[in-house]
């Protein structure tokens, strides 16, 4: 326990380290000082970069909300009184008496200038401050914004397509205010624009401005997106016609793992097409029709023969193993002319169908030899020849009349049902060549 006398004493705080920090701050830059201000000098930072822009006629963007400058205007100062207070100001003056326009890759005079905007002065946010503060590091005007609207807020209003030159003013404060000096640098002249006109200026801005990297990345992303969209346009994403059925494009030939039960098995492809779960001809199952029955078109629509773009993924029939196809009276071979088999086009002939009767024929080579047969309904649709063998399944869709369930053996097929449908079928006669 301390004595009551000790309790009444205020605790002793050491402030020497605080005073030392303040003294160090005041001394920083003092070595460049001159209390007489006779040796005051202001030098432009990044002079070489400014010269590169000036050679191409520098441009600065002006917007409604204001845009910062690049290159950033920075100056090094020496010769101030370290203990005096100064404010740094920035304004812009017209560099000439012209309005400019960009024609055929160069700036040319484009008429009389517009009336000068009200004088706008930007005060550096560190103002006022000691001379030592201004001399210890370059003074940067990185926060100044250029606008083409008179909206205040410390922004500088400039007229678009006019040439300007920045000026830096140093004013001594804390006593009788007097102008110390004004400095301008011809290499900092620029033309105010709402969008860059010279592509070389744009390239320099992107190259040297660290904040323009986001603009560059966005441009690269857009270019990559355009390339991907262009590549996608070259691939047929719709449905190409094989005979009377619509086969989906390359992106749709891999159906979901559990297709609808009323549809037949999907068209099998080789493992090279990344459809591993649908190995070709697994268990000798026949692959009858492509999955999307809903795309069957019964209207007399003419389809363009674009086999090279739509069917690059289908293997030639030479690489297909023979399929064991059950023989039913519902599968009818369809003969075609010799010109169809030897023609260079995959869909050379159109056969018209009308209601009549047909005579079933045994299925011996219609599916495994040359071109395969098709199932033609009694509809006034024009069908084209199928270029490659496509097999049929024993399961039928409810879309077909008199279809038998998929799980019934061959012996349970009702032949009378097909006889009753005889009037729905038509004989097929290829047109004369």
From Swiss-Prot:
InterPro entries: p53-like_TF_DNA-bd_sf (IPR008967), T-box_DNA-bd (IPR046360), T-box_sf (IPR036960), TF_Brachyury (IPR002070), TF_T-box (IPR001699), TF_T-box_CS (IPR018186)
Keywords: Activator, Developmental protein, DNA-binding, Nucleus, Transcription, Transcription regulation
DNA-binding region: 49-217
Any Pfam family the entry gives: T-box
Domain of life: Eukaryota
PROSITE patterns noted in UniProt: TBOX_1, TBOX_2, TBOX_3
Induction per the UniProt record: By FGF-4 and activin.
Transmembrane parts of this sequence: none
Name of the protein in question: T-box transcription factor T
């Amino acid at each position: 326990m301390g004595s009551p006398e000790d309790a009444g004493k205020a605790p002793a705080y050491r402030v020497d380290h605080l005073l030392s920090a303040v003294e160090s701050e005041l001394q920083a830059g003092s070595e460049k000082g001159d209390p007489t201000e006779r040796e005051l000098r202001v030098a432009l930072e990044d002079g070489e970069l400014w010269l590169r822009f000036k050679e191409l006629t520098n441009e600065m963007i002006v917007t409604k909300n204001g845009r910062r400058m690049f290159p950033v205007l920075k100056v090094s100062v020496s010769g101030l009184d370290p203990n005096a207070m100064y404010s740094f100001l920035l304004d812009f003056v017209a560099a000439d008496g012209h309005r400019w326009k960009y024609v055929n890759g160069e700036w040319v005079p484009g008429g009389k200038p517009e009336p000068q905007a009200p004088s706008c002065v930007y005060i550096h946010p560190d103002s006022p401050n000691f001379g030592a503060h201004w001399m210890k590091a370059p003074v940067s005007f990185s926060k100044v914004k250029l606008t083409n609207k008179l909206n205040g807020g410390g922004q500088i209003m400039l007229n678009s397509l006019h040439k300007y030159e920045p000026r830096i003013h140093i004013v001594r404060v804390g006593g009788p205010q007097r102008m110390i000096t004004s400095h301008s640098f011809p290499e900092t002249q620029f033309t105010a624009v709402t969008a860059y006109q010279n592509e070389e200026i744009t390239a320099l801005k992107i190259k040297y401005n660290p904040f323009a990297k986001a603009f560059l990345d966005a441009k690269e992303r857009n270019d990559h997106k355009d390339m991907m969209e262009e590549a996608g346009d070259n691939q047929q994403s719709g449905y190409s016609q094989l005979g009377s059925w619509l086969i989906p494009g390359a992106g749709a030939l891999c159906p979901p793992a559990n297709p609808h039960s009323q549809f037949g098995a999907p068209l099998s492809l080789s493992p090279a097409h990344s459809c591993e779960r649908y190995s070709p001809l697994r268990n000798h199952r026949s692959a009858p029709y492509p999955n999307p029955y809903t795309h069957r078109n019964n209207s007399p629509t003419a389809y363009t023969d674009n086999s090279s773009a739509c069917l690059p993924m289908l293997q030639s029939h030479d690489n297909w193993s023979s399929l064991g196809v059950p023989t039913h009276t519902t599968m009818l071979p369809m003969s075609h002319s010799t010109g169809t088999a030897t023609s260079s086009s995959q869909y050379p002939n159109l056969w018209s169908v009308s209601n009549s009767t047909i005579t079933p024929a045994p299925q011996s080579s219609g599916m495994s030899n040359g071109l395969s047969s098709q199932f033609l309904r009694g509809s006034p649709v024009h069908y084209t020849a199928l270029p490659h063998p496509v097999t049929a399944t024993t399961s039928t869709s409810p879309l077909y009349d008199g279809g038998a369930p998929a799980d019934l053996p061959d012996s349970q097929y009702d032949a009378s049902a097909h006889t009753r449908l005889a009037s729905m079928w038509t004989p097929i006669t290829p047109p004369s060549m």
